[in-house]
């Protein structure tokens, strides 16, 4: 139906007859001439229709051109010629196609929005097929496609095996809720959609495949936001007979190559490394954005003898923290803006936010100054590096909570004061805690997942020091986004059972839920480790969008709906009966 793509018609084709197919981007009838911007996935070319006096065929052609509306689907035959007025905004702007034939392949109904408009997100998702026609959306989808193609080429060339793992599998506790699928042939029993291929890829290492990868679809029934979807795609990888640095060095080289190939970005020749403890101390986050130069400063030693009880209580608590954040130029903040920062911190658990503001002339404005002697106050300002024109925020309380809300303030200040440097800042965060204490459940939970190996090999040591145990987990962070997470796995069945026990999973429950894994580890499991990268998140970073929905062809809303297909939707009673499911009416 076509000889060339619209966006690739250029000067080399001048004088030649071409056949094009695409959508009517714009049609303009200027009376004596019609101009049609014809669009396909490669771009736009101008089609010109010039009626010839006394020529019935050209008059009919002009009539067809004059009748065209937005998004009508056309096949156009014509001769390429040089344009009198060059359009530098188009790749095809030096040429035009003089139409000799136009066939309307399909008429478009009146549009809810035009391809060059940017309507509300609900409208975009309801008419996703129209949204995806927009040049910006085409660009972002192509970025994703190039990313996946480049990853496959890179791994295939290095002897990784692309192996599929089951979509219908066993429900296992991995942090989020499972999506459940009733098993028709086994009444009362259910499959689960995988939250990740974690256990299958470990079993593939036991099976001797050595190097595995998969572009895997994963499913988690959890609350949605701009960087999270119910179903998502990850690059899943696993290596046999490796230590942490073996995995990290390989995927670091891979990321450098992929970013160069896909978006022509040169990532750092060596990614910096930081322990989890250092990241939390300096940045209040386990995924710090290193483009923002601001850092948290611990001030507990300077305030533990002050007369401000909020500070002294936290400073004298072994699990407490008093941290400061200096914002250069922050003295311009009004009282209302300071209250806005306090409200932002409250979203992350802050019960209050103290501050010291220094005017350009050195005048102090602070609700906490009265609690310090002149010498102690001066020492505090010196310790945090405060100068004229700055504001310093202070947070006090439990260590983790203070780190969280002060880290959130750091990000807010970085963006609002234009302190985010241009470029790309990759980072390895290592040595994560093995466990964290869940106050509500009154038990330990795994910070990564239950299959991450501890840094110690001795089970007695792990049991005795579970609260402070460090794991062999690691994350790759880019511009404040965790783009990959991995670890060295537990390969000994006795260690895996001990970790289950520490997580409150007894022997009987472990056997019921993970018996297949424990059995596999008993038959000569090699030391192994791996990592998984979020394809959606990396594609969004490469495409320059904050929402992963922009790089997913058919995403869900934050309300977990597909507006285009109207999913989820009710199921007929006979279908439910086939899978032995009854729906209870919603309790009011």
UniProtKB/Swiss-Prot annotation:
Organism domain of life: Bacteria
Q: Where in the cell is it found?
A: Cytoplasm
Cross-referenced SUPFAM superfamilies? Class II aaRS and biotin synthetases, GAD domain-like, Nucleic acid-binding proteins
Q: Which CDD domains match?
A: AspRS_core (cd00777), EcAspRS_like_N (cd04317)
Tell me, what is one Gene Ontology molecular-function annotation carried by this entry?
ATP binding
Keywords annotated in UniProt: Aminoacyl-tRNA synthetase, ATP-binding, Cytoplasm, Ligase, Nucleotide-binding, Protein biosynthesis
Gene transcribed to yield this protein: aspS
Q: Name one GO biological process term.
A: aspartyl-tRNA aminoacylation
Q: What is its EC number?
A: 6.1.1.12
The entry's protein name is Aspartate--tRNA ligase
Task: Report residues binding ATP.
Answer: 220-222, 229, 482, 534-537
Q: Which residues bind L-aspartate?
A: 174, 220, 448, 489
Enzyme class comes to ligase
Which reaction equations make up its catalytic activity?
Answer: tRNA(Asp) + L-aspartate + ATP = L-aspartyl-tRNA(Asp) + AMP + diphosphate
Query: Is Ligase tagged as a keyword?
Result: yes
Q: Is the keyword Aminoacyl-tRNA synthetase in the record?
A: yes
């Amino acid at each position: 139906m076509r000889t060339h793509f619209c966006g690739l018609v250029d000067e080399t084709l001048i004088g030649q007859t071409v056949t094009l197919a695409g959508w009517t981007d714009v049609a303009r009838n200027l009376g004596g001439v019609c101009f049609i911007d014809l669009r396909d996935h490669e771009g736009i070319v101008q089609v010109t229709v010039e009626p010839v006096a006394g020529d019935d065929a050209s008059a009919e052609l002009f009539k067809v051109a004059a009748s065209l509306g937005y998004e009508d689907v056309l096949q156009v035959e014509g001769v390429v010629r040089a344009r009198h007025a060059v359009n530098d905004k188009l790749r095809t702007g030096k040429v035009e196609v003089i139409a000799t034939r136009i066939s309307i392949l399909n008429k478009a109904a009146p549009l809810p929005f035009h391809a060059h408009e940017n309507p509300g997100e609900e409208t975009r998702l309801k008419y996703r097929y129209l949204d995806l026609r927009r040049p910006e959306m085409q660009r972002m989808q192509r970025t994703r496609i190039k990313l996946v193609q480049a990853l496959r080429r890179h791994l295939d060339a290095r002897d990784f095996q692309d192996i599929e793992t089951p979509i219908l599998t066993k429900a296992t506790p991995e942090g989020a809720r499972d999506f459940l699928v009733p098993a028709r042939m086994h009444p009362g029993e259910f499959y689960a959609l995988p939250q990740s291929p974690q256990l299958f890829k470990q079993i593939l290492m036991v099976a001797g495949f050595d190097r595995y990868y998969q572009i895997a679809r994963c499913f988690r029934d959890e609350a949605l936001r701009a960087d999270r979807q119910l179903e998502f795609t990850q690059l899943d990888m696993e290596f046999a007979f490796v230590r942490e640095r073996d995995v990290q060095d390989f995927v670091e080289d891979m990321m450098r190559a992929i970013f160069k190939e896909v978006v022509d970005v040169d990532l750092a020749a060596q990614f910096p490394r930081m322990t989890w403890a250092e990241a939390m101390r300096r940045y209040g986050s386990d995924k710090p954005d290193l483009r923002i130069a601001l850092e948290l400063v611990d001030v507990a030693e300077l305030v533990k003898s002050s007369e401000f009880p909020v500070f002294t209580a936290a400073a004298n608590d072994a699990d407490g923290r008093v941290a400061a954040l200096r914002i250069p130029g922050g003295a311009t903040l009004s009282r209302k803006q300071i209250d806005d920062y306090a409200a932002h911190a409250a979203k992350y658990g802050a019960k209050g936010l103290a501050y010291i503001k220094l005017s350009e002339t050195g005048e102090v404005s602070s609700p906490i100054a009265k609690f310090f002697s002149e010498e102690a106050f001066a020492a505090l300002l010196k310790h945090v590096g405060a100068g004229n024109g700055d504001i310093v925020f202070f947070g006090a309380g439990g260590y983790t909570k203070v780190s969280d809300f002060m880290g959130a303030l750091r990000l807010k200040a970085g963006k609002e004061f234009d302190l985010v440097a241009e470029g790309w800042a990759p980072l390895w965060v290592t040595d994560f805690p093995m466990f964290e204490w869940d106050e509500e459940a009154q038990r330990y939970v795994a910070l990564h997942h239950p299959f991450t190996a501890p840094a110690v090999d001795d089970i007695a040591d792990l049991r005795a020091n579970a609260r402070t145990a460090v794991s062999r987990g690691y994350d790759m962070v880019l511009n404040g986004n965790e783009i990959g997470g991995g670890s060295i796995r537990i390969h000994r069945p006795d260690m895996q059972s001990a970790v289950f026990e520490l997580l409150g999973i007894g022997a009987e429950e472990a056997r019921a839920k993970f018996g297949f894994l424990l059995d596999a580890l008993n038959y000569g499991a090699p030391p192994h480790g791996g990592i998984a990268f979020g394809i959606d998140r990396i594609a969004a970073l490469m495409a320059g969008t904050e929402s992963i929905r922009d790089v997913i062809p058919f995403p869900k809303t934050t309300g977990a709906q597909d507006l285009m297909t109207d999913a989820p939707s009710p199921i007929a009673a006979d279908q439910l009966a086939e899978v032995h499911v009854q729906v209870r009416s919603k309790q009011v």
